[in-house]
Amino acid sequence: MEEECRVLSIQSHVVRGYVGNRAATFPLQVLGFEVDAVNSVQFSNHTGYSHWKGQVLNSDELQELYDGLKLNHVNQYDYVLTGYTRDKSFLAMVVDIVQELKQQNPRLVYVCDPVMGDQRNGEGAMYVPDDLLPVYREKVVPVADIITPNQFEAELLTGRKIHSQEEALEVMDMLHSMGPDTVVITSSNLLSPRGSDYLMALGSQRTRAPDGSVVTQRIRMEMHKVDAVFVGTGDLFAAMLLAWTHKHPNNLKVACEKTVSAMHHVLQRTIKCAKAKSGEGVKPSPAQLELRMVQSKKDIESPEIVVQATVL
């Protein structure tokens, strides 16, 4: 019998579309993982639409759900995955749950996308309350094993600006020293060696050699920019990175190539379908730009490698 690998995913849920748990659960299941989803919010759709309705889970309600799992002795996990959170007390409760689960299973891996903000027109802007930053910096990152910040979030966490690849590598080393063994800066403003049509991502993984010494693998990836605003891509990225680092535990290069290549296929299919629906010269709507997840099942399962990572 194949060994079961179980993920506790604490993220947002939408009725229509693919963000948060909706973007993470399907790919993880396709790749063979059991996923237990806690929905931090339940909205009709993501907030990029003109309207949305729904409910938000508070920290007491999160505790209640977790207590239910505990009472039935079904709170054994191999992974915890978290993404967008707006509430400080909710985030602190997540940390408490992760710490308790790690006491039960010291090999548990916590994958955290520290969603706080992004760069718009060259200026960084936070889209969560400012009081979340110290919680991420002091409580979340120290218990995380894999983190997937964008450049702006990596700068916030370390207090260091990134203007070059060298500075990005230094920032990743600072993040390693805060706790996580694997750091992937999922997008940056750095100029790619391949030109301005490409988006650059960087990764760094620390592993222990049999003699106890620490080995660091650093990689760079360049992805062709797509002229559209997608929502849920970070959630999909973190979920697939979880899956592929599990399957290739000491090879960040291969794990990232598979993750980014699958992303490429999903986004290309999405933009093609969106343009076909919107018509020539018309900007696709948020509904038309929802990720074509189900249609991309084969690409998620066994992605054709179209993005090669460079080992630095």
UniProtKB/Swiss-Prot annotation:
EC numbers on record: 2.7.1.35
Keywords carried by this UniProt record: Acetylation, ATP-binding, Cytoplasm, Kinase, Magnesium, Metal-binding, Nucleotide-binding, Phosphoprotein, Potassium, Sodium, Transferase
Protein residues bound to ATP: N150, T186, S187, M223, H224, K225, V226, T233, G234
Activity control, per UniProt: Activated by K(+). Activity is increased in the presence of Na(+).
Signal peptide boundaries: none
Tissue specificity as recorded in UniProt: Ubiquitous.
One of the GO BP terms on file: pyridoxal 5'-phosphate salvage
Binding site for pyridoxamine: S12, T47, D235
InterPro entries: PM/HMP-P_kinase-1 (IPR013749), PyrdxlKinase (IPR004625), Ribokinase-like (IPR029056)
Active site residues per record: D235 (proton acceptor)
Cofactor(s) needed for function: Zn(2+); Mg(2+)
Binding-site residues for pyridoxal 5'-phosphate, renumbered to this chain: S12, T47, Y127, G232, T233, G234, D235
Modification Phosphoserine, positions: S59, S164, S213, S285
Entry binding sites for ADP: N150, T186, S187, M223, H224, K225, V226, T233, G234
Pathway(s) this gene product operates in, as recorded in its UniProt entry: Cofactor metabolism; pyridoxal 5'-phosphate salvage; pyridoxal 5'-phosphate from pyridoxal: step 1/1; Cofactor metabolism; pyridoxal 5'-phosphate salvage; pyridoxine 5'-phosphate from pyridoxine: step 1/1; Cofactor metabolism; pyridoxal 5'-phosphate salvage; pyridoxamine 5'-phosphate from pyridoxamine: step 1/1
Catalytic activity, as annotated: pyridoxal + ATP = pyridoxal 5'-phosphate + ADP + H(+); pyridoxamine + ATP = pyridoxamine 5'-phosphate + ADP + H(+); pyridoxine + ATP = pyridoxine 5'-phosphate + ADP + H(+)
GO molecular function: ATP binding; metal ion binding; pyridoxal kinase activity
Protein family membership: Belongs to the pyridoxine kinase family.
Entries under PANTHER family matching the protein: PYRIDOXAL KINASE
Record's protein name: Pyridoxal kinase
Organism: Ovis aries (Sheep)
Lineage: Eukaryota, Metazoa, Chordata, Craniata, Vertebrata
